Each structure stands twice: as C-alpha cells, then as structure tokens.
Design a protein with these regions (language model features):
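Structural beta-alpha unit
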Residues: 1-3, 16, 30, 72-105
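General small-molecule cofactor/ligand-binding pocket signal
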Residues: 36-38, 81-85, 134
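Glycine-rich, Arg-bearing micro-motifs that act as flexible, cationic patches
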Residues: 102-127
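Short secondary-structure boundary segments
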Residues: 39, 106-108, 137-138
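Short, acidic/small-residue loops that bind anionic groups at enzyme active sites
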Residues: 128-137
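A conserved short alpha-helical segment within the catalytic HATPase_c
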Residues: 64-72
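Small/aliphatic-rich secondary-structure junction motif
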Residues: 2-54
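A short acidic, glycine-rich active-site loop
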Residues: 52-63
Length: 138
C-alpha cells in the first residue's frame, strides 16, 4: 500500500508565503499530493497579561483561511488540510513536515528586513529540515 505524498507549506500572510502556497499547490497537482498548510502563533515575550478580546489563534486561523482562499483559486481539486499551531514557526513547520515529502516556505516572511535574501524561518527550515525544502523567492 502506498501512502499519499504530503507537501507542507508555511503560511504567515506575507506576499512571500502567498507565492509559496501557489507554488506548493501546483506541485501538489502534479504529484497528487495532499497540501498541509501550517500557520503558527505565539504571544510576544513582552506581553505578560493577555488583553481582553485578543485571540491570536483565531486571528491566525483567519489569516490562513484568507491566504488559502486567494492563493488556491483554480486549485480546487487539491486536497488541503489546515493546521494552526501555538509556538515558533520554524519548529512548528518541521514538526508538521516529519512525514512530508516536501516542505515549501517563502523566502521572507512578515518580519523580514529589506535586503535580506533569506528570512529566519526559511533559514531554520533549510538548516534543520528532515525532508527536502523549497524556498520560493519573491
């Protein structure tokens, strides 16, 4: 029995991650893979009390849904699962990619500094990933 290949893609709402989702969905179409879209969230270190009405998990889920809706237009035949995880993005992606055939990330996320060739999450995944990692450039 052969299992369906899995492509994990990191989603943070940045233009780079939108391009990564498009690239990953095309690859999923070509290979018959399931697309596993992963977003993560965590409280900034400087926040000690959660402000009323703030729900980072729900905000992250909303961003994930919006990016997928826009980026997957025309890819309705691709099977997609969505995962919102509490924690730093690099380790969250690698945990979700343990059984994956491919991990796809954008070259730069929301926190990238102008002129950087590779963002910290992309670099983390390339250095520590256990499966092939594709970095989609802007």
């Amino acid at each position: 029995m052969t299992s369906v290949p899995v492509i994990v893609v990191g989603v943070d709402g940045s233009p780079s991650s939108q391009r990564a989702v498009r690239w990953a969905s095309e690859q999923a179409k070509l290979t018959g893979a399931t697309l596993r879209a992963v977003s993560s969230w965590r409280w900034p270190n400087y926040i000690t009390i959660v402000p009323p009405g703030v729900d980072l998990a729900s905000d992250t889920r909303r961003t994930l849904d919006e990016v997928l809706e826009e980026a997957l237009t025309g890819s309705e035949d691709v099977s997609v699962t969505r995962h919102v995880i509490e924690g730093p993005p690099g380790p969250a992606l690698l945990t979700q990619a343990q059984d994956a055939t491919l991990l796809v990330v954008g070259a730069q996320g929301r926190a990238a500094f102008p002129g950087m060739l590779l963002g910290s999450v992309a670099e983390y995944c390339v250095r520590h990933g256990s499966c092939p990692v594709v970095v989609v450039r802007p």
